[in-house]
């Protein structure tokens, strides 16, 4: 699975997380929703399908259920905030904060030439 800072859509991140967990172990939407504190077993599935929205308030609990902490959790909440922003000013603020966080934590994988240079 890609690093969270490579995502711009929280729905896509949740879906990729679910598919990765499902591929590696016994995991269900019900278990995922339960871990995140939702009573509806399919709520997060509906979020991924665009039928429901994840509130900014519950974004933290979903992030925790996915094992995100620190800047990763903050980035996830910012993706949700950006999606819910009504005004251009709020959207721009969430976008700029998300970009700054991504830039601060983005890792670059060295290519063969760079690796050979630093050997």
Q: Language-model features: where?
A:
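A short, Lys/Arg-rich alpha-helix, primarily the initiator
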Residues: 1-30, 118-119
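Short amphipathic recognition helices of helix-turn-helix/homeodomain-type DNA-binding modules
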Residues: 3-4, 65-66, 70-111
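DNA major-groove recognition helix of helix-turn-helix
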Residues: 18, 47-48, 58
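Residues within the helices of the helix-turn-helix
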Residues: 30-31, 60
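Recognition helix of helix-turn-helix/homeodomain-like DNA-binding domains
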Residues: 34-54, 63
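Short, solvent-exposed alpha-helical "recognition" segments
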Residues: 51-56, 82-86
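Hydrophobic micro-packing sites on short alpha-helices
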Residues: 58-66
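Internal, conserved structured core segments that host functional sites
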Residues: 110-119
């Amino acid at each position: 699975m890609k690093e969270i800072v490579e995502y711009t859509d929280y729905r896509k991140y949740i879906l990729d997380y679910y598919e990765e967990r499902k591929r590696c172990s016994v995991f269900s939407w019900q278990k995922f929703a339960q871990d995140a504190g939702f009573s509806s077993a399919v709520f997060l599935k509906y979020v991924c399908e665009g039928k429901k929205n994840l509130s900014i308030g519950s974004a933290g609990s979903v992030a925790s259920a996915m094992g995100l902490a620190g800047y990763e959790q903050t980035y996830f909440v910012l993706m949700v905030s950006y999606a819910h922003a009504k005004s251009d000013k709020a959207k721009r603020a969430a976008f700029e904060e998300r970009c700054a966080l991504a830039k601060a934590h983005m890792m670059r994988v060295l290519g063969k030439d760079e690796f050979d240079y630093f050997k």
